[in-house]
Amino acid sequence: MILIIYAHPYPHHSHANKRMLEHARTLEGVEVRSLYQLYPDFNIDIAAEQEALSRADLIVWQHPMQWYSIPPLLKLWIDKVFSHGWAYGHGGTALHGKHLLWAVTTGGGESHFEIGAHPGFDVLSQPLQATAIYCGLNWLPPFAMHCTFICDDETLEGQARHYKQRLLEWQEAYHG
């Protein structure tokens, strides 16, 4: 099962993420958990989230980039749900062997991520990748949709189809 952890603080203003979800939902075995819809008060039901994760084979963190990072509710979700003894540490093997895909949208182009001595978008994924590896997850190459503020409908649609194709390819590779 593919579990999409969707963290968009303003989902009604989204064009790119909305299309990505629409395409992903056409696949069998996809569950979407919209964190800002489920937890507007930031009071996360840890047991429910861990139960959803336990059913997943592929976990997707889908969100818009905010100040070169993840939205605050997704950060809190990781802090609370990936708990010691469950996701890591002694007895913390619940996520071992599962896959993680970071699916992120950005308003700027790739050149916006040429930062200092460590240029490139990949540098921004390192904390997420380290978290995944520490918890025994298999980190997949990220899916990034850039320039979403200026993309025309045809480009957004094409990128959303590409996202669906990435998910489908994962399903075919791991569940034939």
Curated annotation (Swiss-Prot):
Q: Identify the cofactor(s).
A: FMN
- Protein location: Cell inner membrane
Q: Which reaction does it catalyse?
A: a quinone + NADH + H(+) = a quinol + NAD(+); a quinone + NADPH + H(+) = a quinol + NADP(+)
Q: Which GO terms describe its cellular component?
A: plasma membrane
> Has UniProt tagged this entry with the keyword Oxidoreductase?
yes
GO molecular-function term, one example from the UniProt record: NADH:ubiquinone reductase (non-electrogenic) activity
How does this protein sit in the membrane? Peripheral membrane protein
| Subunit relationships | Homodimer. Interacts with KefC.
- What's the protein called, per UniProt? Glutathione-regulated potassium-efflux system ancillary protein KefF
Q: Which organism is it from?
A: Escherichia fergusonii (strain ATCC 35469 / DSM 13698 / CCUG 18766 / IAM 14443 / JCM 21226 / LMG 7866 / NBRC 102419 / NCTC 12128 / CDC 0568-73)
